[in-house]
UniProtKB/Swiss-Prot annotation:
Gene3D superfamilies per record: Ammonium transporter AmtB like domains
Site entry: Twin-His motif. Important for optimum substrate conductance: 157, 305
Keywords: Ammonia transport, Cell membrane, Membrane, Transmembrane, Transmembrane helix, Transport
Subcellular location as annotated: Cell membrane
Domain of life: Archaea
UniProt organism field: Archaeoglobus fulgidus (strain ATCC 49558 / DSM 4304 / JCM 9628 / NBRC 100126 / VC-16)
Protein name: Ammonium transporter Amt3
Subunit structure: Homotrimer.
Family the UniProt entry places it in: Belongs to the ammonia transporter channel (TC 1.A.11.2) family.
This protein's GO CC annotations: plasma membrane
Transmembrane segments: 6-26, 44-64, 89-109, 117-137, 150-170, 187-207, 220-240, 247-267, 269-289, 309-329, 335-355
Amino acid sequence: MQSGDISWLLISTALVVLMTPALGLFYGGMVRAKNVLSTITMCFVALAIVSVQWILLGYTIAFGDDVSGLTGNLVFIGLRNVSMSDYGFVAFQMAFAAITLAIIVSALAERVKLSAFLLFGILWTTFVYDPIAHWVWGGGWLAGIGALDFAGGTVVHISSGFSALALALLVGRRTGYGEYNIEPHNIPMTLLGTALLWFGWFGFNAGSALEANDVALNAFLVTNTSAAMGALSWMFASWLKGKPGSLGVASGAIAGLVAITPAAGYVDPLSALVIGGVAGVVCYAAMLLRVRAGVDESLDAWAVHGVGGLWGAIATGIFASVGATGLVAGNAQQLLLQIIAALVATAYAFLVTLILAKAVDAAVGLRVSSQEEYVGLDLSQHEEVAYT
């Protein structure tokens, strides 16, 4: 790689690493004050877990030599046989794996033990994230059939969003959910997290070009375009039911960012307007559906990341025109391939997450006690409080 490309990759890696604590702020503002430290800590712990797991095992599962299209072999275990010139790519992909695990905190907030999250995080990254990353990016079978995922719509967002749904269904509702309102305690904190996520997403998407080139420039612009349209469309959709909330603007921006992720290197800015606009409305509708169904997926990872990732994967097959072609450009087959990849990732992540979560529950128990939940996880899990 040229020195300029190395510099851009390192900057992008730092931006993506920033996204995990930014997600902690985004989530932390939406929980009650008695659980804010626990929620943010889980996101930091996700970064720590994956940083170690990736070096020891994760990278070789995802990017080792292909074995039957399903997994990488152990050629890179402990980063053995990885040249120093590839360390930037290793770190960049590690940051992706870390935030993917952190997204799942949405389904665990305010009721799950830290010890259970530690064990689950190791297992989930190894048996869900790493194999899907290999299928799509590491020369696996989805890459072989021609499925497109520029920066992680399938690998990151579908896998985490539908894993969060599986966990929410298994863990069950927070005590009092549906009986009284469980309100966010600090929306400005969530807005700060949104701003940092939006900023970091430029590294997430434009950095996935792996070079400082025209593809990165395109990805940078369409990322911002889709985020803006997502924020506006969610805001206007919610306005039809009442006042437009600041939390809706934040969620819409994230929905737009999620949806453009798989498409960022393949679509033009006009297509990004459509992708982001649809994402805001579709993800808002998914959130309303979740609430109506009584599913306590606390911070809406399923609605925003799962559904947004599904739409983004499909939209890539519709609008791709830069470096690949989709339905609009006359390639209907690409749309079919995108649907296949999205459905496979959805089913695999959901089912394997259920299995892993049941195993963790049997081993150490997932939920805190009702008394611990009542006093809050900040005190019961950390013996700390956020505010005095």
